[in-house]
């Protein structure tokens, strides 16, 4: 096992900068997830750690060793890709031991490691099968096993579940989490799926256009996003945003005017906030309230109702801003499309973002953070 540090790491192809001044500390045994939209540079960052991409400037350390000029095979890292990349003519055992065989390992060592890893990944009964006889989830476990038998210090996973169907992705997510707890290895995992990030990570790194937008624990990013990008990316359905204007400030409070002219005091940091400033109020669909238990409400026309059984999602068009807000409530809510529907805004669950997108720190203490 080993820690990983990136110091001012930049990657550029000509004039195109895909990763800019990345600074990260990944602790020994930590499970870290790089998450962000397509093209944000998360896979490039992983490939630089693996040695598959050169670093334009900056320094990469694994343990105490600077790795910039160290070949991939000597870095002590193992990588699992989106594609299983299994040899179809080899058995599961032969696929898992292939790297060790190329490295000249003794047959007894190969057999011992393959059998140990097969037990961990529940593949022992499949060792003689060929890849074509395996399910997608089993093939992915073989790909993970092939990396594990090499006993890397750092385990890199580049969107390993993207080729699986929804049910298998949930199953493999659980298995990867259990595997990390059992092995205690340093793992760095790349995904565009924020559900995978929230459920797997000890620490999440949110990337936006080649820069680190925020680093933190899952619930920290959910409850206290650093900017509007993180707020909109983490959470599903995404956070609702409303244009507001600042009408007053006080110590640790900001009053804003909503599109329907109602005013609401928000418990957020007020330092640097100017009266008259245009800002954005954010609130998650699951934090909106029924109108009968809220002091501040918004009213609109129901556009779409999504009944999911365990919850209902209602898309409401607010006339003053001509955009839909999403309201999410547990259980079944019976409402017709076209009906008038009112929702409430609890001040303590609201977020406030400046014009540059940066957040005014929320002061309400959330559980688990």
From Swiss-Prot:
Name the predominant localization: membrane
User: Which keywords does UniProt give here?
Assistant: ATP-binding, Cell inner membrane, Cell membrane, Membrane, Nucleotide-binding, Sugar transport, Translocase, Transport
Residues that, per the record, bind ATP: 36-43
Q: Where is the signal peptide?
A: none
Q: Which reaction does it catalyse?
A: D-maltose(out) + ATP + H2O = D-maltose(in) + ADP + phosphate + H(+)
Q: Where in the cell is it found?
A: Cell inner membrane
Q: How does it sit in the membrane?
A: Peripheral membrane protein
- Please give the SUPFAM superfamilies that the UniProt record associates with this protein: MOP-like (SSF50331), P-loop containing nucleoside triphosphate hydrolases (SSF52540)
Q: Which residues form the ABC transporter domain?
A: 4-234
Entry's InterPro entries?
AAA+_ATPase, ABC_transporter-like_ATP-bd, ABC_transporter-like_CS, ABC_transpr_MalK-like, ABC_transpr_MalK/UgpC-like, Mo/tungstate-bd_C_term_dom, NA-bd_OB-fold, P-loop_NTPase
Q: What is its EC number?
A: 7.5.2.1
Biological function = Part of the ABC transporter complex MalEFGK involved in maltose/maltodextrin import. Responsible for energy coupling to the transport system.
The entry sums up its family as follows: Belongs to the ABC transporter superfamily. Maltooligosaccharide importer (TC 3.A.1.1.1) family.
**How is this protein named in the record?**
Maltose/maltodextrin import ATP-binding protein MalK
Per the UniProt record, the source organism is: Salmonella typhi
Gene designation: malK
């Amino acid at each position: 096992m080993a820690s990983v540090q990136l110091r001012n790491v930049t990657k550029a192809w000509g004039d195109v900068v895909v990763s800019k001044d990345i600074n990260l500390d990944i602790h020994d045994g930590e499970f870290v997830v790089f998450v962000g939209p397509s093209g944000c540079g998360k896979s490039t960052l992983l490939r630089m750690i693996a040695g598959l991409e050169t670093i334009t400037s900056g320094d990469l350390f694994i343990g105490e060793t600077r790795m910039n000029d160290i070949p991939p095979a000597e870095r002590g890292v193992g990588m699992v890709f989106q594609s299983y990349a299994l040899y179809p003519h080899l058995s599961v055992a032969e696929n898992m031991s292939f790297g060790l065989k190329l490295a000249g390992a003794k047959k007894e060592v190969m057999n011992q490691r393959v059998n140990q890893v097969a037990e961990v990944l529940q593949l022992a009964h499949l060792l003689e099968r060929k890849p074509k006889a395996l399910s997608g989830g089993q093939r992915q476990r073989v790909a993970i096993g092939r990396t594990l038998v090499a006993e890397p210090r750092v385990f890199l996973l580049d969107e390993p579940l993207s080729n699986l169907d929804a049910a298998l992705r949930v199953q493999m997510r659980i298995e990867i989490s259990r595997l990390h707890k059992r092995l205690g290895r340093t793992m760095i995992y790349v995904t565009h799926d924020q559900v995978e990030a929230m459920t797997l990570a000890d620490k999440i790194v949110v990337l936006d256009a080649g820069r680190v937008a925020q680093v933190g624990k899952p619930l920290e990013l959910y409850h206290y996003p650093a900017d509007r990008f993180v707020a909109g990316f983490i959470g599903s359905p995404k956070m609702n945003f409303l244009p507001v204007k600042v009408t007053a400030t006080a110590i640790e409070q900001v009053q804003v005017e909503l599109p329907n002219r109602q005013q609401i005091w928000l418990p957020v940091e007020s330092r640097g906030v100017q009266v008259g400033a245009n800002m954005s109020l954010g609130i998650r669909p699951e934090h909106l309230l029924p109108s009968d238990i809220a002091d501040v409400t918004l009213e609109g026309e129901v556009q779409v109702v999504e009944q999911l059984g365990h919850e209902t999602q209602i898309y409401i068009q607010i006339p003053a801003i001509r955009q839909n807000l999403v309201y999410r409530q547990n259980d079944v809510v019976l409402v017709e499309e076209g009906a008038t529907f009112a929702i409430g805004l609890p001040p303590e669950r609201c977020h406030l973002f400046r014009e540059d997108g940066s957040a005014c720190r929320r002061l309400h203490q959330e559980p688990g953070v």
